[in-house]
Amino acid sequence: QFSRVAELVPARLSKSGEPKPFYEALLTKDSLTRRAFSSPSDLARVSEMNQPRAWQAGFPAMGGVGSALGLAKFYDWVLRQEFLEELIKPRIKGLDEIQRIENSFGFGVMLGLGPNRDCFGHPGAGGSYGFANVETGMSYAFVMNHFESNLFPNKERLDLVLSAG
């Protein structure tokens, strides 16, 4: 089904609203942020993620290939699982040493990503976003192949989430 995978298009450089500490860390050689965003080294550029070997690699923290509907269905499924309460229990809170912002995580998901603290999910590369709202039972996903230069979804995307949630 490789013919159904859209080509990823790198972001154009812009003056984004991203936190300055993140970009400073990203540009600092040997910083934790740079190491995290450069790993694995042979898949560090967007163009390399357009190759079937990247789609098949199955890295747990990057390179997911799917549709917005598929991602939203995944979060909808998670909402109905017995492990939900354990998944969204805060495990760590404070300064995220990679993203250089205050953050909170459960088991593999970021917490507080929507209109209430019971929202969980994760942003993806280039502005993609998937989350679920425990309070309303709603799941949401937005995927894109034309990357934005932001680490997190832009204001328009977040406004969509808040209006739907």
Predicted segments with their positions:
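Catalytic loop of the DD-peptidase/beta-lactamase superfamily, centered on the K-T-G motif
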Residues: 1-165
